[in-house]
Amino acid sequence: MARFRGPVGKVSRRLGIGITEKGQRILNKRPDPPGQHGAAARRRALSDYGAQLREKQKAKFIYGVLERQFRRLFEQAARRSGVTGEYLLSLLERRLDNVVYRLGFATTRAQARQLVNHGHIVVDGRKTNIPSYTVKVGQVIAVRPQSRSRTYFKNLVDSGVLNKHRAPEWLRLNPAELSGTVVALPRREDAEAGINEQLIVEFYSR
């Protein structure tokens, strides 16, 4: 299955949540679902299954995860003791591409995924080009030393934008070193807002 590269505005309007900043801007201007009967579709109540499916799709699109990967993450979360939905969100937050995004090294998760794919990111000093890699507490995520001389990363440092960036509390950002440390597991409130994880659990528990 190919990764989604379609119009984020349409998807954001269909799901009722901005899956990117651009998607949120479009949603603010045009909140109705796309299509001729968008306003009517917005008023029509979803079935239980429809609501569960929509929540799963929201999380998939926001975090940029394919269906097979998403199911695997859910199964991993379900095997753990505790609240399955919250642990699922923790796994999504701890994906390497999401961490690169949360640290401010990229402006979107798609860009963060590209940086990882192209070998610009190291974990504990080792090049890691797998966006789905799950980071652990204590690990250090950084821009590869050989990549720091590239214009993009030099601008990140020279512009001071990282000094103003607010990383979540579970990550400690070192702007000068283009690195960040995982200091804790992400909490429920650290995950992307607008996702009802319990509906996702219900979807896979049918």
Curated annotation (Swiss-Prot):
GO MF annotation, one: structural constituent of ribosome
SUPFAM superfamilies for this protein: Alpha-L RNA-binding motif
Pfam families: Ribosomal_S4 (PF00163), S4 (PF01479)
Protease listed as a keyword: no
Biological-process GO terms, alphabetical: ribosomal small subunit biogenesis; translation
Annotated S4 RNA-binding domain residues: 94-157
GO cellular component: small ribosomal subunit
InterPro entries attached to this UniProt entry: Ribosomal_uS4 (IPR022801), Ribosomal_uS4_bac-type (IPR005709), Ribosomal_uS4_CS (IPR018079), Ribosomal_uS4_N (IPR001912), S4_RNA-bd (IPR002942), S4_RNA-bd_sf (IPR036986)
Keywords of the record: Ribonucleoprotein, Ribosomal protein, RNA-binding, rRNA-binding
Top-level taxon of the source organism: Bacteria
Assembly and oligomerization: Part of the 30S ribosomal subunit. Contacts protein S5. The interaction surface between S4 and S5 is involved in control of translational fidelity.
Family stated for the protein in its record: Belongs to the universal ribosomal protein uS4 family.
Role of this protein: One of the primary rRNA binding proteins, it binds directly to 16S rRNA where it nucleates assembly of the body of the 30S subunit.
PANTHER family linked: 30S 40S RIBOSOMAL PROTEIN (PTHR11831), SMALL RIBOSOMAL SUBUNIT PROTEIN US4M (PTHR11831:SF4)
Protein name: Small ribosomal subunit protein uS4
UniProt source species: Chloroflexus aggregans (strain MD-66 / DSM 9485)
Gene this chain is encoded by: rpsD
